Amino acid sequence: MRVRNISNAKELLKEYKEYVAAPQLFKEQWHTYFENQNPIHIEIGMGKGQFIRTLAKLNPNINYIGLEKVEELVLKSVRSIEAEEICNISLINWNAVKLEEILGEGEIERIYLNFSDPWPKARHDKRRLTHHGFLDIYQKLLKDHGEIHLKTDSKALFEFSLEQFTQKNFTLVEVIEDLHGSTDKEIAKTEYEEKFIAEGKPIYKCIARIE
């Protein structure tokens, strides 16, 4: 994804109440931030944020956290959130490798991983967001019976992820190898997803649950 550089993006972000500049201050306290006890779902690598904004509007009784390491993408999304007046979402400019610095054990009910970088070279497998190193972190952060929802256009990443989930004793609740070819029940789609659908590319999806 090509992103136009905005030199003062970090300063501009601070103007928006939906942006959390110091998320580590809310570790184990996110219900205090949202001022309610609603479930918390997080999307890791939200890109421009279309997917998580759609979910937030559809599910006002769920709190959403959008995490993205590229400042310019966070800025684009937070502007849309303000324009659409969405109240149950916060955005973080953060790297997934530091998740445990901002989230407490059992604080999250669902994690979304949408079209994450597949890191195709074998020597980079530890960077994949479904590598067992990341799964160890997710298992700490998720509540009992918490879920990971994965969507990808990469068959290799999908197969790798299924293997990793199985090795870490997740239950595979749903495994679909052509999501939009079999059914188009997915209401919330990412920008990438819409592009791939238009090109006729299959989308792979799975839901993995902690039992």
UniProtKB/Swiss-Prot annotation:
Function: Catalyzes the formation of N(7)-methylguanine at position 46 (m7G46) in tRNA.
NCBIfam families xrefs: PRK00121.2-2, tRNA (guanosine(46)-N7)-methyltransferase TrmB
Protein name, entry field: tRNA (guanine-N(7)-)-methyltransferase
Reaction(s) the record says it catalyses: guanosine(46) in tRNA + S-adenosyl-L-methionine = N(7)-methylguanosine(46) in tRNA + S-adenosyl-L-homocysteine
Pathway listed: tRNA modification; N(7)-methylguanine-tRNA biosynthesis
Record GO cellular component, one term: tRNA methyltransferase complex
Record-linked InterPro entries: SAM-dependent_MTases_sf (IPR029063), tRNA_(Gua-N-7)_MeTrfase_Trmb (IPR003358), tRNA_methyltr_TrmB_bact (IPR055361)
UniProt xrefs under PANTHER family: 3-DEOXY-D-MANNO-OCTULOSONIC-ACID TRANSFERASE/TRNA GUANINE-N 7 - -METHYLTRANSFERASE, PENTACOTRIPEPTIDE-REPEAT REGION OF PRORP DOMAIN-CONTAINING PROTEIN
Family classification: Belongs to the class I-like SAM-binding methyltransferase superfamily. TrmB family.
Record bears the keyword Cell wall biogenesis/degradation: no
